[in-house]
Curated annotation (Swiss-Prot):
Function: Phosphorolytic 3'-5' exoribonuclease that plays an important role in tRNA 3'-end maturation. Removes nucleotide residues following the 3'-CCA terminus of tRNAs; can also add nucleotides to the ends of RNA molecules by using nucleoside diphosphates as substrates, but this may not be physiologically important. Probably plays a role in initiation of 16S rRNA degradation (leading to ribosome degradation) during starvation.
Subunit annotation: Homohexameric ring arranged as a trimer of dimers.
Organism: Anaeromyxobacter sp. (strain K)
Family statement drawn from the similarity comment of this UniProt entry: Belongs to the RNase PH family.
GO molecular-function term, one example from the UniProt record: tRNA nucleotidyltransferase activity
Name of the featured protein: Ribonuclease PH
GO BP term, pick one: rRNA processing
Length: 239
């Protein structure tokens, strides 16, 4: 039995609280247990140079951790003058994941930026960020639709993410920090609501793992992602 009485294939307590920002076109405060991430969506009526002139739009993301989101205070990256490789990797992952949810041409020549700010970290910040950012993205797109600026709905599918790993020889879903730090295998899985894979990041710590364990982890992750899809849908129904 895991913390809080969780079974090996149980998610942490999940909360997706939409519309928490007064100013952003879309927002969601997402909680995966003790990992809390504020996700906001902002719409800008212009596109980056590599998209300009194509008629398509763009979805991108930025990610950051508040100084005291961890056990000891971290220096702000702005104070250091540069982002870490980890930060750049995660925000690119979030952007790729969210672009899988939409038809960029249907968005039109505008950019939606998802800002994911970690308030408190206890493992799985990138997976929580993706799951909450999707809710914020849909709200922002619905706002554009209400202004009658879109001919069709650009959102084609939902996207969510979850971690999974091998801990003490057993598959565990949605790892917290302590589990992640001792896992023999650590994996992040991003998938659409219909179970199509967007991205799989997996690493063995110490020794390789067989294909059978990969399949077991993917099965566990996809089951958890099905539950996350339900929670996203419920959050988006909230008035």
């Amino acid at each position: 039995m895991r913390k809080n009485g969780r079974g090996e294939l149980d998610l942490r307590p999940i909360l997706l609280e939409p519309r928490v920002s007064k100013h952003a076109e879309g927002s969601c405060l997402v909680r995966f247990g003790d990992t809390h991430v504020l996700c906001t969506a902002s719409v800008d009526e212009k596109v980056p140079p590599h998209v300009y002139g194509t008629g398509a739009g763009w979805v991108t993301a930025e990610y950051g951790m508040l100084p005291r989101s961890t056990h000891e205070r971290m220096q702000r990256e702005a104070a250091r003058g540069k982002q870490t490789g980890r930060t750049l990797e995660i925000q690119r992952l979030v952007g790729r994941a969210l672009r899988a949810a939409v038809d960029l041409r249907a968005i039109g020549p505008r950019t939606v930026t998802l800002d994911c700010d970690v308030i408190q970290a206890d493992g799985g910040t990138r997976t929580a960020a993706i799951t909450g950012a999707y809710v914020a993205l849909v709200q922002a797109v619905r706002g554009i639709q209400k202004r009658r600026q879109l001919a069709q709905d650009p959102v084609k599918r939902s996207v969510a993410a979850v971690s999974v790993g091998i801990v003490a020889g057993q598959v565990h879903l949605d790892l917290d920090y302590d589990e992640d730090s001792t896992a023999e295998v650590d994996m992040n899985v991003v998938a659409t609501g219909d179970g199509a894979l967007v991205e799989v990041q997996g690493t063995a710590e110490g020794k390789p793992f067989p294909r059978a364990e990969l399949d077991r982890m993917l099965d566990a992750a996809l089951a958890g992602l099905s539950r996350l899809k339900e929670l996203q849908e419920a959050a988006l129904r909230t008035p």
